[in-house]
Swiss-Prot record:
Comp. bias regions, Polar residues: 234-244
GO biological process: activin receptor signaling pathway; anatomical structure morphogenesis; cell differentiation; convergent extension involved in axis elongation; embryonic pattern specification; intracellular signal transduction; negative regulation of transcription by RNA polymerase II; neural plate anterior/posterior regionalization
Xref: InterPro entries: Dwarfin, MAD_homology1_Dwarfin-type, MAD_homology_MH1, SMAD-like_dom_sf, SMAD_dom_Dwarfin-type, SMAD_FHA_dom_sf, SMAD_MH1_sf
Name recorded for this polypeptide: Mothers against decapentaplegic homolog 2
Amino acid sequence: MSSILPFTPPVVKRLLGWKKSASGSSGAGGGGEQNGQEEKWCEKAVKSLVKKLKKTGQLDELEKAITTQNRNTKCVTIPSNCSEIWGLSTPNTIEQWDTSGLYSYPDQTRSLDGRLQVSHRKGLPHVIYCRLWRWPDLHSHHELRAIETCEYAFNLKKDEVCVNPYHYQRVETPVLPPVLVPRHTEILTELPPLDDYTNSIPENTNFPTGIEPPNNYIPETPPPGYISEDGEASDQQMNQSMDTGSPAELSPSTLSPVNHGMDLQPVTYSEPAFWCSIAYYELNQRVGETFHASQPSLTVDGFTDPSNSERFCLGLLSNVNRNATVEMTRRHIGRGVRLYYIGGEVFAECLSDSAIFVQSPNCNQRYGWHPATVCKIPPGCNLKIFNNQEFAALLAQSVNQGFEAVYQLTRMCTIRMSFVKGWGAEYRRQTVTSTPCWIELHLNGPLQWLDKVLTQMGSPSVRCSSMS
């Protein structure tokens, strides 16, 4: 390998001297072959950046920012259309559609453009250099937010993107206000069964590459088949243009019960040790043990690592009832899907060469779709599939409506996701249990919060039984 890196310029050595190790200190980490490969990769990444910045005269500004650790330094930019510079193929774009028509979001097609490739490893340039010089444990661009003075921040989608690591900050998880729950609430005389969309025929949606709708997109009325039982819920960007309130734009504190004279008890949210649990299915059969996710970033893939806390490897799992269709589908899972839990939000990114299909009631609520809508995520694209703050607002609102309304929210805490093969109205397979390979996520934090709220509210006056 020494022939590949015959000479390291002094400026590269200086910049590498400020590289943060996993322990948070500057300089190189420990030994070992893996660390040696990582060091060589970091050197290549820095060399590549230095070469570009020398051409634009920004190298001194980068070195100043890193050595002074000062956010008041200037932007340090490289071209954002790195798909051409680095020989990457044009990333997939996604269109949103359903049985009633086509909806296009052209403004969102660049959200995953500009990935940088260094020695067969791809990543967004500002993430690579923030990880190198500030946060070694950084997983995704979702964890970063640009400072207000950054003129070429990644989220601005300009022709140049700033890679000054001190122009970005880590996203902090927002503190959710407690939900005020009356100790005794008037309960419906009978608790209807929980809505189950497993066997319903969902609509299908292809979602834009970006995880947010454009600012100017406000659906006047949902398309046919997209009537949400909870009403339209819009993202924060959409709410800025709306006159009437929706659950997503109201904070939990504004939706707390207003029953005067009642004994209101605050029920707080707390993060569990495992933020989600994942079960794997082949057709209608559960396969293997439940995977409990403790890391903020994890992948569900088709490979065979048995002991990595950041990977749920489906390739290891055996099933005596596995048929040829399932076997063929498993071969195409590949790198699968990456799940992020960052800042109270859950994202799904398709790493596979084949699309993944997601049914997320929380996401569907946000865009005013039917709760059973299935969203297709092509390779290289990502989607926000859950938001704690939106859920908190809905929970606080539902407390006013009684035990049954709160109980119905449990369906929002379950997300189904199939690999390679989709299901729904536009597919031969009508239900998720007809797809060869799929997973079910249970979001433990929201589920435990619901449990505490329901416990505080008390049981329904008439319990469900075989006779009710």
